[in-house]
């Protein structure tokens, strides 16, 4: 950034330099990246800060640099005014966070531009998957957890259940399925971007629920990957959720095929008291040295493999090929169908569309199964001394 600012100063006739940043701010100033940026590059006049979803009611000021942020998901508009001082730098003279509500009239010209862009979503993107944005995939009468619930409430959530189940369904029902069953599918909370309201669930809503990333094919949307982990590593994955995700809530894991119980009162890295496979009909004990097929999205696979470094070696996950060789490039294990990447959001859309039409109107219905949870992640809140020390892992 410093080099870019110097280049601008040398080659351009500018009054103000604004940085649009996806680094974010934190309460701990030493870890607040956009504040560190303001200190390191004092020639920046204004930093529009994103990533951490922070609503700054007042700007953060370091020297002559202002850091501002208006929250998340277009809920607010940030409005500010600045006046140039005699030395050429700028002083903020007004700053306001304006909630975006239905009381605000749409700007017709802007809405028209948006509508034109939305038309290209169908023709330039969704057509290659056989969808249109307004296409109804399923009708829903289930109260799903919110995206925030997945991060803030440390327990099983039906939103995580349906997404992880969708991965298994899509892989095992793909046109060129290799016949190897999926043992476990994993969805971290940090990859989920929205929930499903009651009523019609459309393609647009499913895409919005898992809209992150891009594949090796250059097409938007993270693809699914297939890796292998040992039984011991699957136990470690459960411990990551139980112990690590309280410090990094985006690492809360929602699984299909892997059930576990944890006690939040036990020692860190020793909170999981029971973990096993569940094929839908029976409990299957994990074998520490056996390899199990695991499906996740590309980003999550890369993130989970970094756990060893993040935990200073205390927790180790090494995703592998079917022969046990460690994976070096996760793009090698992207799941494809007829030569095209199987995107995570498309997997969810396919699963939604596969549900039984229970009311006879020609549209699938989200099953009652998802109206409750199913012992995939159980919380044992006991403080009994026996429960606090039993089954050390």
Name each model feature, range by range.
Residues 71-393:
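Catalytic centers of hydrolytic enzymes
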Residues 1-102, 245:
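Acidic, metal/ion-coordinating pockets
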């Amino acid at each position: 950034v410093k080099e870019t600012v110097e280049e601008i100063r040398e080659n351009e006739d500018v009054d103000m330099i604004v940085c649009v940043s996806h680094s974010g701010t934190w309460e701990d100033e030493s870890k607040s990246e956009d504040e560190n940026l303001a200190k390191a590059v004092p020639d920046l006049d204004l930093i529009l800060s994103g990533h951490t979803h922070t609503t700054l009611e007042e700007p953060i000021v370091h020297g002559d640099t202002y850091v501002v942020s208006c929250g998340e998901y277009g809920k607010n508009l940030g409005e500010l005014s600045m006046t140039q001082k005699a030395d050429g730098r700028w002083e903020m003279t007004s700053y306001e966070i304006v909630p975006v509500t239905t009381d605000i009239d749409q700007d017709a010209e802007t809405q028209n531009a948006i509508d034109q862009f939305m038309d290209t979503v169908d023709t330039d993107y969704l057509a290659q998957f056989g969808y249109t944005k307004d296409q109804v995939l399923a009708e829903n009468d289930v109260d799903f957890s919110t995206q925030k619930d997945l991060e803030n409430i440390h327990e099983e959530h039906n939103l995580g259940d349906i997404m992880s189940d969708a991965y298994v369904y899509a892989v095992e029902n793909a046109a060129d399925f290799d016949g190897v069953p999926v043992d476990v599918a994993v969805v971290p909370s940090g990859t989920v971007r929205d929930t499903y309201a009651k009523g019609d669930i459309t393609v647009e809503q499913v895409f919005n629920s898992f809209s992150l990333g891009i594949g090796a094919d250059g097409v938007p949307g993270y693809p699914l990957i297939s890796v292998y982990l040992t039984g011991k590593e699957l136990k470690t994955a459960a411990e990551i959720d139980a112990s690590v995700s309280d410090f990094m809530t985006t690492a809360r894991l929602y699984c299909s095929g892997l059930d576990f119980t944890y006690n939040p009162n036990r020692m860190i890295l020793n909170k999981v008291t029971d973990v096993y496979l569940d094929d839908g009909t029976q409990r299957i004990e994990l074998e520490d040295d056996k390899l199990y097929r695991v499906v996740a999205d590309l980003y999550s696979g890369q993130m989970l493999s970094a756990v060893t470094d993040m935990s200073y070696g205390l927790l180790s996950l090494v995703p592998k090929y079917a022969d046990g060789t460690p994976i070096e490039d996760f793009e090698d294990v992207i799941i494809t169908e007829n030569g095209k990447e199987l995107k995570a959001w498309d997997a969810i859309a396919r699963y939604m569309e596969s549900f039984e039409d229970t009311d006879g109107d020609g549209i699938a219905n989200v099953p009652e199964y998802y109206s409750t949870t199913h012992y995939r992640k159980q919380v044992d809140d006991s403080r009994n001394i026996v429960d606090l020390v039993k089954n050390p892992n």
